[in-house]
Amino acid sequence: MRRGLIARSPVELPDAVFDARLDRVRAAMRDAKLDALVIYTNNTRTAGVSWLVGFVPYWSEALLVVPRDGAPYLVAALTFRVKTWIERVSRIGEVLHNPRVGLKAAQQIASLQKNAAVGIVDFDGLPAGIADDMREGGPGLALSDAEPLFAALRAKADPADIALAGKAAAIAYQALSQARGARLNGMIANAEQQARLDGAEEIYLAAAPDLARDSRFMRIEGEVALGNSFALRATVAYKGTWVRLVRTYCDADIARKAAARFAQAVAQLPSDSGFAGFTSWLVEGCRMAQPLDPLIGSRLGEGYPPLPGALVSVQAALAIDGQTVLLGAPALIGRSGEASSLIADPLYD
């Protein structure tokens, strides 16, 4: 199903967007004296490759190779029969097929320069078998971790990122707005149907069915009884951009008070000072390949504070008049001297 929902939009992501991103990557590669950059992708680690070429795998795995000079190419474990689909939904110079993607990628790089300097994004997160295959396929290649290089490039959202996050947030908001009814499963079904109709590539819905008992989100299987107040969380992907929104079903006055405190806290990010008095909070965003990496939060320790201009999704829990309220929405981190801002309304009718 997901494959059928993935499509390239030359209006929302024109070639110039990918060209500008690749130009920035290649400039950083020249500074770091790298001959090639390699990014791993699978159906859970989509954000690095989709950001550069628009490819989003619906299953299996692949390596994107970005030469310092030349068009990027994809080495995919998917069979040759999906070659035309990959070419249709992404902007890639060539698609190579091999079940051992690391071996083929290294052989291809080494065929042009046997001692090439190759940076691997999130080297520590690369599956060991693929890393071993790369060493076998290119024994003379100098492999290094390119995490700092790529994370610095991904830290700041460009205008296309912001536009797509706004569209994804609108889809998630409308989905949660349609989550109505007396039974939780029916509410979830209504929300998912709305998101699919609005073009979501993916939507994951989780629930906290009774906030008086437990504020943790869970995947719902079977029918679950609802408490007097409960919450739904929608995680939505659109054109490779992921956001999270949270809706708490509670007294309207309590919801308004909670939303105001949440917006005030978000405005002070990346400082955590606004979340004083909150039960818990979490800021997620894309650093490399995971679309929603935990960055900072009440339970994370030092973490990775988002830089000015970063797109993030924020979740928080707080008590208003003794009642637990969960909130969540995407936000844009302000630049120097600017406040950060939500890009979706945390209040629902």
Spell out what each predicted region is.
Residues M1-D349:
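Active-site neighborhoods and metal-handling regions in enzymes and metal-associated proteins
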